[in-house]
């Protein structure tokens, strides 16, 4: 059992989350310059410029389980890095809104596929004692990527004059190259090797790094016992409860409004009265708080469990979202608004942000884990795309005052709290093969 190797493999694969976070938020700095450059309508800007990457994530998450099972988790992760590299360079040299949208779509496919491959891989090379915090490293890297993207946008503002947005987008190619190189050095998932390649010997060598020597034979037997089910349909009726859990946690994740805030943070803060430079710097503070409270979540998830963090996060969501709506409706000071936005971000980071990828990667058995991860993440990205596409239009209808939108998100988080209290099971301290649910 080699804890250092397990951590190194996990943090390497979790770097896909860094590219995910960077790619997701880097567009916030380019949003307004692109709108002015190509003079796009609110609907076109929302559906194509801001949401095209999200439509790519829908495709990547829907079909990400196919390469995960066919060519393996590791090889899928390598191709994900290549997609990020192509998207970064292509977006930077885009010559019109259509070419820009195409390359953003390519990056979105990489993001969507990474939300399937990375948590699946990490859950399969970790043990029950550390699985929560190791899978949550993916989320840590997402928020670290978000923070670096905000900071990068702030530093590059004015760097290239009217084309500074091209530098903001193109710089992502550098970490993409390093990610590809690092992933080449991690082993294949032992569970994938047994189930899809029948290579028990190679899997055994990897399992020795994960479990004590005395448990290896037992683990191999448990994994093999699910081999005859690897072609099972996820919709066979055997996994209805897991499907419902994955759908609801992903649905509520996006109905918190998190992507709306992250994508439109500078615009939201400017509409509340902050100057452009101040709003970008405030976005950096959002990224920092996100990172800090994700670190708290990493420390707590295997100690107190997934449900506990979701309860704390839900309560924080409700208080902060209703307060943000109040700030907009009654035109309160923009710095008061920023405080409640930071509380919202902290609530997300310690709750949904830390838990979602861990929980979905745990609840499905070996035979359909990648497919289940794909279903949960596809739900996440479909709603992310829909919300991001329609919010520019809705804000325009509300005379650029999004207060009622935040009231709506607050109501949805009341429903999430009910889901956590009444339906969500605890998965802390249970091995993947021992995870049982009543459908």
Indicate where each model-derived feature is located:
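Alpha-helical transmembrane bundle of multi-pass membrane proteins
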Residues: 1-199, 225-439
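Solenoid-repeat scaffolds in large eukaryotic assemblies
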Residues: 202-206
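Conserved H-loop
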Residues: 213, 217, 275
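Short, well-structured alpha-helical segments
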Residues: 216-225
């Amino acid at each position: 059992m080699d804890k250092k190797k397990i951590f190194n493999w996990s943090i390497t694969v979790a770097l896909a989350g860094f590219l995910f976070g960077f790619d997701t938020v880097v567009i916030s700095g380019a949003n307004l310059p692109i709108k002015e450059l190509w003079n796009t309508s609110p609907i076109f800007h929302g559906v194509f410029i801001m949401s095209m990457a999200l439509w790519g994530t829908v495709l990547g998450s829907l079909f990400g389980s196919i390469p995960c099972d066919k060519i393996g988790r590791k090889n899928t992760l390598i191709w994900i890095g290549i997609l990020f590299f192509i998207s970064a360079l292509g977006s930077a040299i885009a010559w019109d809104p259509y070419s820009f949208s195409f390359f953003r779509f390519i990056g979105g496919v990489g993001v969507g596929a990474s939300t399937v491959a990375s948590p699946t891989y990490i859950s399969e090379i970790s043990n029950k004692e550390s699985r929560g915090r190791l899978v949550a490293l993916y989320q840590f890297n997402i928020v670290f990527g978000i923070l670096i993207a905000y900071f990068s946008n702030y530093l590059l503002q004015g760097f290239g004059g009217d084309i500074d947005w091209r530098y903001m987008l193109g710089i992502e190619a550098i970490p993409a190259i390093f990610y590809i190189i690092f992933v080449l050095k991690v082993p294949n998932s032992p569970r994938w090797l047994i189930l899809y390649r029948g290579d028990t010997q190679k899997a055994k060598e990897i399992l020795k790094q994960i479990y004590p020597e005395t448990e290896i034979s037992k683990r191999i037997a448990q994994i093999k016992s699910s081999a005859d089910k690897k072609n099972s349909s996820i919709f066979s009726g055997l996994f209805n409860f897991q499907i419902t859990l994955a759908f609801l946690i992903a649905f509520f994740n996006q109905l918190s409004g998190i992507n709306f805030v992250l994508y439109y943070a500078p615009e939201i803060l400017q509409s509340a009265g902050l100057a452009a430079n101040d709003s970008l710097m405030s976005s950096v503070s959002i990224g920092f708080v996100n990172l800090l409270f994700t670190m708290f979540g990493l420390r707590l998830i295997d100690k107190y469990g997934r449900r506990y963090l979701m309860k704390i996060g839900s309560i924080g969501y409700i208080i902060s979202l209703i307060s943000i709506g109040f700030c907009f409706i009654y035109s309160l000071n923009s710095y008061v608004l920023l405080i409640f936005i930071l509380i919202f971000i902290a609530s997300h980071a310690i709750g949904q942000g830390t838990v979602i990828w861990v929980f979905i990667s745990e609840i499905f058995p070996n035979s359909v884990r990648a497919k289940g991860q794909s279903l949960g993440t596809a739900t996440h990205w479909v709603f992310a795309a829909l919300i991001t596409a329609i919010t520019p239009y809705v804000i325009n209808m509300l005379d650029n005052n999004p207060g009622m939108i935040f009231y709506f998100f607050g109501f949805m988080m009341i429903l999430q709290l009910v889901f956590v209290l009444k339906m969500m099971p605890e998965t802390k301290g249970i091995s993947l093969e021992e995870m049982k649910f009543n459908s």
